A protein has these predicted regions:
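A late C-terminal transmembrane helix in Major Facilitator Superfamily
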Residues: 336-366
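Central cavity-lining transmembrane alpha-helices of secondary-active solute carriers
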Residues: 55-73, 259-271
Length: 393
């Protein structure tokens, strides 16, 4: 696998960069086929109560953090990141097969989630490998990262509607087996087309214990991204059940809403990537938080499909900027620690799931699904407070 041709002739077809785009799309599809329907799967197929649904997401996030931090430490210190991604894809495929055929809550929680945690770690490891590839070949890392993020968003345009179509039209078994196929194809693409980039001595020094620079700002950014992703996780857990059980709207609307938001995220990410150096990452994050506040306020009062779909523009601005800027913000605050920075960012998503799982389960069990959006608004206000204290980079 070569790295030099891309730098020597950037205007010719670049097989490696194209492979990165396809792998980003496939890792996105694998997740987009599973996550949007998980709360509905647990409710309808596993017959879990709202509190148990929330606990499942919380437990999943805790296990995921332990797995991803362990893998990030090893990947930053030694070894071939490419082989690690293939290994993660293989375990992700096994997790999908287990979810396809098993309906025992505790087996899914402890065995299925353990396997799927490795599968989901393939995505941040791919982004870390892409950052190293961009740095070594002289590519503009910010825009390349945004293009990869756009591929994940494209997968989420297709994934949620397809997931609901497969689950409702056929079965959850068919849906999970489709995700397993995505992992198999992804692993094959990584093995045959992505570069092997051995760690040099200078890079092997990096550790995962803590950022070597900007520790206070990294901690603030961790809190900011955790709260923002937490609100998004509340939405993903709660929205399908809110749409179906409280608003009594068609099941497919939930998938269409997620797909619409993901489609609008693509131009949002690209525009944010273009303006990142001109406006600064902090200002863009402020714009995202403002859009998020308006979005969740709108979810409290919206009841018609047209309004719910219209609100997805605000959701796209919120998640589109967060999804692209957040990762780069961590990498800029932690130079020389690409794997740790990327995985630390990914763990804000997982910690967000921990918070969201607990809040969503308790709120739905005690009050209703509508009440969950009030918690999201409170979390966004806390995000604003943290954002006012972080420095720009």
């Amino acid at each position: 696998m070569h790295n030099t041709p891309a730098a020597a002739s950037p205007k010719t077809f670049d097989l490696t960069s194209t492979a990165f785009l396809i792998v980003a799309f496939l890792t996105g599809i694998a997740g987009a086929l599973q996550t949007p329907t998980l709360s509905l799967f647990l409710t309808d197929e596993v017959h879990a109560r709202p509190a148990m649904v929330g606990f499942f997401f919380t437990g999943s996030a805790v296990i995921g953090i332990l797995v991803s931090q362990f893998l990030a430490g090893r990947s930053d210190k030694k070894g071939d990141r490419k082989k690690l991604i293939v290994f993660c894809c293989a375990l992700g495929m096994l997790a999908c097969v287990l979810f396809a055929w098993n309906r025992n809550y505790f087996i899914l929680l402890f065995v299925g989630v353990f396997l799927s945690s490795f599968g989901s770690t393939a995505n941040p490891q791919m982004f870390a490998l892409a950052r190293e590839h961009a740095d070594r070949t002289g590519r503009e890392a910010v825009m390349f990262s945004f293009i990869l993020r756009a591929q994940v968003s494209l997968a989420w345009v297709i994934g949620p509607p397809l997931a609901y179509a497969l689950a409702m039209g056929f079965s959850f078994t068919v849906m999970y087996l489709s995700a397993a196929v995505a992992f198999v194809v992804c692993g094959a693409m990584v093995w045959f087309f992505l570069p092997s980039m051995r760690k040099e001595t200078a890079l092997a020094i990096g550790t995962l214990e803590a950022p070597r620079r900007n520790r206070r700002d990294t901690l603030l950014l961790f809190a900011i991204c955790t709260l923002m992703w937490g609100t998004n996780s509340l939405y993903i857990i709660n929205m399908p059940l809110f749409i179906i059980n409280e608003l009594h709207l068609p099941e497919k609307l939930a998938g269409v809403m997620m797909g619409t938001a993901a489609g609008l995220e693509i131009p949002t990410m690209l525009i944010a990537g273009y303006f990142a150096k001109r406006l600064g990452k902090r200002l863009l994050m402020c714009i995202a938080v403002a859009a998020g506040f308006c979005f969740y306020a709108g979810m409290l009062v919206a009841h018609s499909p047209v309004v719910l779909l219209g609100l997805q523009l605000l959701n796209a601005i919120y998640i589109g900027i967060l999804g692209g800027i957040g990762m780069l913000y961590f990498q800029d605050l932690m130079p020389g620690q690409a794997g740790s920075a990327t995985t630390l960012y990914t763990n804000t998503i997982r910690v967000g799931w921990i918070i969201a799982g607990s809040l969503a389960g308790i709120a739905a069990e005690i009050w209703n699904y509508h009440a969950v959006f009030w918690f999201a608004l409170v979390m966004i206000v806390a995000t604003m407070a943290c954002l006012s204290r972080i420095k720009d980079v």
